[in-house]
Amino acid sequence: MAIVLEAKERADKKRSTLHRIRSQGGIPAILYGKKVENKMIFVSTAELEKALREGGRTSLLTLKVGGEEHSVLLRELQRDPLRGHLLHADFQAVDMSTEVDIDVEVRLVGEAPGVKDGGVLQQNLHELSIRVLPANIPPVIEVDISGLQVGDTVTVGDVKTDGKFEINHEPSEVIATILPPQQEEEIDSGEQQEAGQPDAAEGRETTPEE
């Protein structure tokens, strides 16, 4: 069952308007999609934080705005880099019968025998881009490493999809490997892939007051 968020429309994107919304416990946002008119909105910061805790960044949400309900995905979320406060959100309305591309967290599960023998676990991919129907988006993609010995790798081709989604990576791409102990100082921990960017650019909202 999708998490429900209440939203209200806002008239403009002036700095004073954005400041007022944030000071009153809201977060400015935009709603966009192929079959909906772009709308400047705001939602409760507390309710959005709760939705993120309960469903994660990739969960399907029901956004209520202007007497209408939209099935949406949270495509971009901006936070204050120093304080961590939410600043802006982009919601994309989706067609439940049309597949979407989305980045999903990779979570390694199990204990690798190679690590117990002194090997070093290196994770190369922290997210996977997948193509999936909105209702089938997994909260995380679990990858079992319980069979990995020193020198073993697990690749994209080893991921079990159960026929619910397609992975937009080459099967040979390495997700994780167990390095020999002497290579520990040479580990490249890997960088988390950037989430996809929505078409809407309004998220930066720095337009000065007119």
From Swiss-Prot:
<keyword id="KW-0699">rRNA-binding</keyword>
<dbReference type="GO" id="GO:0006412">
    <property type="term" value="P:translation"/>
</dbReference>
<dbReference type="InterPro" id="IPR020057">
    <property type="entry name" value="Ribosomal_bL25_b-dom"/>
</dbReference>
<dbReference type="InterPro" id="IPR029751">
    <property type="entry name" value="Ribosomal_L25_dom"/>
</dbReference>
<keyword id="KW-0694">RNA-binding</keyword>
<dbReference type="GO" id="GO:0008097">
    <property type="term" value="F:5S rRNA binding"/>
</dbReference>
<comment type="similarity">
    <text>Belongs to the bacterial ribosomal protein bL25 family. CTC subfamily.</text>
</comment>
<dbReference type="GO" id="GO:0003735">
    <property type="term" value="F:structural constituent of ribosome"/>
</dbReference>
<feature type="region of interest" description="Disordered">
    <location>
        <begin position="175"/>
        <end position="210"/>
    </location>
</feature>
<feature type="compositionally biased region" description="Basic and acidic residues">
    <location>
        <begin position="201"/>
        <end position="210"/>
    </location>
</feature>
<comment type="subunit">
    <text>Part of the 50S ribosomal subunit; part of the 5S rRNA/L5/L18/L25 subcomplex. Contacts the 5S rRNA. Binds to the 5S rRNA independently of L5 and L18.</text>
</comment>
<dbReference type="InterPro" id="IPR037121">
    <property type="entry name" value="Ribosomal_bL25_C"/>
</dbReference>
<keyword id="KW-0689">Ribosomal protein</keyword>
<dbReference type="InterPro" id="IPR020056">
    <property type="entry name" value="Rbsml_bL25/Gln-tRNA_synth_N"/>
</dbReference>
<keyword id="KW-0687">Ribonucleoprotein</keyword>
<dbReference type="Pfam" id="PF14693">
    <property type="entry name" value="Ribosomal_TL5_C"/>
</dbReference>
<dbReference type="InterPro" id="IPR020930">
    <property type="entry name" value="Ribosomal_uL5_bac-type"/>
</dbReference>
<dbReference type="InterPro" id="IPR001021">
    <property type="entry name" value="Ribosomal_bL25_long"/>
</dbReference>
<dbReference type="GO" id="GO:0022625">
    <property type="term" value="C:cytosolic large ribosomal subunit"/>
</dbReference>
<comment type="function">
    <text>This is one of the proteins that binds to the 5S RNA in the ribosome where it forms part of the central protuberance.</text>
</comment>
<dbReference type="Pfam" id="PF01386">
    <property type="entry name" value="Ribosomal_L25p"/>
</dbReference>
<protein>
    <recommendedName>
        <fullName>Large ribosomal subunit protein bL25</fullName>
    </recommendedName>
</protein>
<dbReference type="InterPro" id="IPR011035">
    <property type="entry name" value="Ribosomal_bL25/Gln-tRNA_synth"/>
</dbReference>
